[in-house]
Amino acid sequence: IQHKHAPGSPTANNFYNMIDSYLAQLDKKGALLALTADHGMNPKFDENGEPDVVYLQTFLDESLGENAARVILPITDPYVVHHGAFGSFATAYLPTGADASKIANDIESIEGIEAAYTNSEGCKKFDLPNDRMGAIIVVSTTHKVIGTSPDRHDLTQLTEPLRSHGGVCDQNIPMLLNKPVIGLPKDHKIRNFDVFSIVLNHTS
């Protein structure tokens, strides 16, 4: 729903009304409820309603030679109806001897790219495992997504303007409980997986 229908739209409102009715029944029975999300979401399309894409594989092919580097999009999955395999995060593997810092700087000069990091920089910033990421890590700005190259994305299945996630701008999410939360350290940065600890250890 959220991929295709923005907050406040009739379909989204009907969806949340349905969920709320079920939660109300659980609350009435005395259940302790906690809700959170895996990620946020933003519109990622231009003024014409078309996906607003930075094709990173194309850029690296032009810079380093065709297929010398390989861009990986973690959002890629077989079900592309919602997001067209476009997200605001990418990692890229570079050929041996390539200057990752220079290439990251070059990528940052592309309109729509918020930041590009070397492996060590990006993994430290986003708490990622170094051995699972490429030589560079890239995030786009709020309303842009990162793709590989145009011929590798099937846009025919996108029936609504693209909404997707993966960037720093998409990190903010709600966490709702039906009981007061107590005893959390004031400087604690809450993340979605903290919901289990909060429910078990910090509710009255």
What are these regions (language model features)?
Residues 1-204:
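Feature captures the catalytic ectodomains and active-site-proximal regions of enzymes
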